[in-house]
């Protein structure tokens, strides 16, 4: 019915040129082909769907999120498809391309000046989102940095897909690595792969 139904189910791809015939197999979860172009669309969708289930969103809600990029792209996409307004707050040092994508999805992008300390700038973005929420009852801040639904997107989705793919191929997992931002990807997938 809509593009959000295509989120997930990304392929697990074997990297053949990185290893020799007697080395371990290296497999990557190819999230670049996910709707929205990254793994963050999974978390955006999960956080918004769970918020809807809890009654935290209404038709006039404004989704506001501080981010350095890909989560904003995912939330802008999900908001556009579901009919919500979106405001993404990000450091001005983040890529112009990401900003443009979010704007094309209909999000308002608010840039906070980065004085050279990205951590301080992100904290300023978070504080601005919190002020917006305090000032306007329509504002919903998913809070990717502390939202357990971020983790659940990987437990229920990404990790389950990896396990299904390796089991179908008869492959045992000896190790796992992941990029690290909010910690949701590595924590969610890692917790499931340990079991």
Predicted regions span which residues?
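PLP-dependent amino-acid enzyme catalytic core
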Residues: 1-195
